A protein has these predicted regions:
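Structured-RNA-binding interfaces characteristic of tRNA pseudouridine synthases
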Residues: 1-199
């Protein structure tokens, strides 16, 4: 049995998040179908994280166990040749069998983009949130600094009941502004349910 670690990128506009759901098209469903086709066996991919409807991913990791001997480069080419234009496999490598995309994950980074202008930018409609009123960058930065470090984040989750611990570490919470474009970057060792959204 081989274990493959795969990195991919996707534009989430047309999908109801990553995780497979009944009666809704998801990234996992599409990718599993194409990966199974290339490996010539029915497989389940293990994603590093759930993403919500419409969320995009730049570097998303998944792992898959397979009996196939396909070389990693052939895997990348084969799957990319079958995927729609809004999903792309970036790389593939063989890893130890105990590697799991979710449980072996050391950190996650989220990027939120805001188009801060009176007028919408039609080229950014599904890539950034349009906010008309002026933002106080300094106030946002001061608030963001409070989250950095190791804290109990239960108050910033909509459900803490099934977690062994609600302690998480935020490595950075940065605000970058360039003209009308505001980028919020948050990196942590993990996030509770809805934690990133509530923060």
């Amino acid at each position: 049995m081989r274990n493959l670690k795969v990195m991919m990128a996707y534009r989430g506009t047309n999908y109801h998040g990553f995780q497979r759901q009944e009666n809704a098209l998801t990234v996992q469903e599409v990718v599993e179908e194409k990966v199974s086709s290339v490996l010539n066996e029915k497989v389940i991919i293990n994603g590093c994280s759930r993403t919500d409807t419409g969320v995009h991913a730049n570097n998303y990791c998944f792992s898959v166990l397979t009996e196939s001997r396909i070389p990693p480069l052939n895997f990348v080419r084969g799957v990319n040749g079958r995927l729609p234009d809004d999903i792309s496999i970036l790389s593939c490598e063989e890893v130890p069998e105990d590697f799991h995309a979710r449980f072996s994950c050391k950190a996650k980074e989220y990027i939120y983009k805001i188009h801060n202008s009176e007028s919408k930018n039609p080229f950014e409609t599904d890539l950034s949130y349009h906010y008309r009123r002026p933002l106080d960058a300094e106030l946002i930065r001061k608030a963001a600094e409070k989250f950095v470090g190791t804290h109990d984040f239960c108050a910033f989750s909509s459900d803490c009941s099934d977690k062994k611990t609600t302690i998480r570490t935020i490595y950075y919470f940065n605000i970058e502004i360039a003209g009308d474009s505001v980028k919020i970057l948050v990196k942590g060792d993990g996030f509770l349910y809805n934690m990133i959204r509530i923060m």
